[in-house]
Amino acid sequence: MESNQEYQVLLYYQYVTIDDPEAFAEEHLRYCKEIGLKGRILVANEGINGTVSGTIEQTTAYMDHMHNDERFHDMTFKIDPHEGHTFKKMHVRPRPELVTLRLEDDVNPLETTGEYLEPKDFYQALQDENTVVLDARNDYEYDLGHFRGAIRPDIKTFRDLPDWVQENKDMLEGKKVVTYCTGGIRCEKFSGWLVKEGFEDVAQLHGGIVTYGQDPEVQGDLWDGQLYVFDERISVPVNRKEHVIVGKDYFDGEPCERYVNCANPECNKQILASEENEHKYLRGCTHECRVTPRNLYVKEHELTGTQVEERLLAIGESLTQEV
């Protein structure tokens, strides 16, 4: 009967001291399983960061439970309706940091962070020629969708961002620097780091891209593409005024918003690919990934050696060619 119920996804975080993250995580996991939630929650000394899915009844109970705890009484939940769960399991894990920057001198967002810009003010900043808008997410997130004119840092993980800034300081110096991320948690710490590094005019999109897309006034305007999310949805829309596809198919460069993982489990690279190209290239991002005996696409579709060779010949490759 669950399939007839309405579900929703909660995205949230709170920087607040949690004295014993391990004990908190253990108890919190028990509670989440008890009420039927699924999702991923990280707990650290510095706070909590989570995405969970459940029925409206389950998620409402969870929000009430959290708001009844003095530490989280004012925590903001970003709510997205969905047809079902967006996770297969429930995980609550203790971590040294909520977002991994691994700074020698850590930043406490409760003490140092950039100015908060509400969606309307951020919308204005996007059109200001003296403002640099910096995407604080990873390159594959940017490639699926981003704010028009935003800078794309060439990074694979968040912890690489400070080094990228140091190498590209000339791009940012003397400008107002405005940064954004999915729900706001990365920017809380990153914008604080920018302030500590001596950037004088630093701001962040309050509540992140999710809040911007839900704002009734801006309606996601000036966002192009889709928003990458870290659950089974993979992507969600943001701009409610127009839809511009910015993603490009890994294989032919055509407009594409469909992410798949390379079929070589040792590679597992995320690539944008149409269904047609996924089949054509055996979901392998390189020849080596296409011909590996561990190729998951070949196993899933139970392809014979002859069938694999036929696919390869169609793209000018062969099982016998040197890798």
UniProtKB/Swiss-Prot annotation:
Q: Which Pfam families match?
A: Rhodanese (PF00581), Rhodanese_C (PF12368), UPF0176_N (PF17773)
Q: What protein does this entry describe? A: tRNA uridine(34) hydroxylase
The similarity comment for this entry is:
Belongs to the TrhO family.
Give any GO molecular function from the UniProt entry: oxidoreductase activity, acting on paired donors, with incorporation or reduction of molecular oxygen
Catalysed reaction per UniProt?
uridine(34) in tRNA + AH2 + O2 = 5-hydroxyuridine(34) in tRNA + A + H2O
The processes (GO biological process) annotated in the record are: tRNA modification
Q: Which PANTHER family does UniProt cross-reference here? A: RHODANESE-LIKE DOMAIN-CONTAINING PROTEIN 7-RELATED, THIOSULFATE SULFURTRANSFERASE/RHODANESE-LIKE DOMAIN-CONTAINING PROTEIN 2
Q: What is the annotated role of this protein in its UniProt record?
A: Catalyzes oxygen-dependent 5-hydroxyuridine (ho5U) modification at position 34 in tRNAs.
Tell me the name of the encoding gene.
Answer: trhO
Give every Rhodanese domain span.
127-221
Catalytic site positions = C181 (cysteine persulfide intermediate)
Asked whether the keyword tRNA processing is assigned, the reply is yes
Arranged from A to Z, the UniProt key words for this protein are: Oxidoreductase, tRNA processing
Query: NCBIfam families, alphabetically?
Result: PRK00142.1-3
Q: What is its EC number?
A: 1.14.-.-
> Matching SMART domains, A to Z?
RHOD
